[in-house]
Amino acid sequence: MSPDGELVPVDSSAVVTAKRKTSQLSRSWISIDATGQKTVLDVDKHVIMHRVQIHARDLRILDPNLFYPSAILGRERAIVLNLEHIKAIITAEEVLIRDSSDENVIPVLEEFQRRLPVGNEAHGVHGDGDLGEEDESPFEFRALEVALEAICSFLAARTTELEKFAYPALDELTLKISSRNLERVRKLKSAMTRLTARVQKVRDELEQLLDDDGDMADLYLTRKLVGASSSVSVSDEPIWYPTSPTIGSMISRASRVSLVTVRGDDETDVEELEMLLEAYFMQIDSTLNKLTELREYIDDTEDYINIQLDNHRNQLIQLELMLSAGTVCVSVYSMIAGIFGMNIPNTWNHDHGYIFKWVVSLTGTFCIVLFVIILSYARFRGLIGS
């Protein structure tokens, strides 16, 4: 309705645009808990921020429409994970993943559903008598391991695929230098440079975590949660009972395995996470080494091609030198012929016809000898010949 009280028709395109903006604000998330149960959450960012207690800047890192480098950030109650197409938030009881249309995310979701409930299944099969065989790793570590394995395998597969096309193309270029082969190698080199930057960023992020025990300690979400529950239980306040059975079982299991991990110096014990990160650091470092070897092979191929081009250039210079020497000799011959061909009165022109034969013969012989002398001097100086 207009300010004058008249009815104004509603623009259908504006309604569609408004609905589209609303759908973008309430982007879908996929939640996977410790039992492998997948739930689709169609909520806005404020609900997610309140759910996992992170800041807006942390959530902005996971926006697929914005470009942010790979990062693993430890927060009070969550781990913010941005590894290429894997954009997730890991808590002590669930994993929240962006509902992306990327086809590479679907296998990661299936892997989360398959591997996250492994500890519970093992406990159900073996019973309480075989606690030693139960997977006692915290939930966040199992989720982090799935994500790291997925991204390392993804980058390794891209590297293998690049090697599959790069090495034959480089070998073909060494055999035949053509515009088609050069353009093909140029595209492969550009792809290798981009892939190397992506692998390098993931490697640097893991290396940064390994170098800082404090950052690794921030990733122990279950330990911090157990410590908070223990401090509450020993106080005069009523005992806090976790409403979630999943988080309650994790607290009891973590307390049963190591009761003292939340007290004293054990709070800085990051050996378990360090071994986990080191394993995938070595894997991503191996992938980076393959790319480095490929870059060195490309550099060697470029050097070989430059040597071939220099050789052809030297051959052209030698040919130019020989043609220049021949041109000098022909010029001398033409000069002598021009002198005798001038229309100048000369006594030699009378009754001395045999002189023409001597002049032609001697001049031709002189030019040939001069040409041989020039080439011999050039060969002696190393200017031609090899």
UniProtKB/Swiss-Prot annotation:
This is Magnesium transporter MRS2-7. One of its GO terms (cellular component) is endoplasmic reticulum membrane. Low-affinity magnesium transporter that mediates the influx of magnesium. Gene3D superfamilies: 2.40.128.330, Magnesium transport protein CorA, transmembrane region (1.20.58.340). Disruption phenotype: Displays plantlets with retarded development under low Mg(2+) concentrations growth conditions. Belongs to the CorA metal ion transporter (MIT) (TC 1.A.35.5) family. The chain crosses the membrane at residues 321-341, 355-375. Has the ability to complement mutants in Salmonella enterica and yeast lacking magnesium transport capability. Keywords: Endoplasmic reticulum, Ion transport, Magnesium, Membrane, Transmembrane, Transmembrane helix, Transport. The keyword Magnesium applies. Its main location: endoplasmic reticulum. A motif (Required for magnesium transport activity) lies at residues 341-343. It is a multi-pass membrane protein. It is found in: Endoplasmic reticulum membrane. InterPro entries: CorA_TM1_TM2, MRS2-like. The gene is MRS2-7. It comes from the Eukaryota. GO terms for molecular function: magnesium ion transmembrane transporter activity. CDD domains: Mrs2_Mfm1p-like. Isoform 1 is expressed in the whole plant. Isoform 4 is expressed only in roots and flowers.
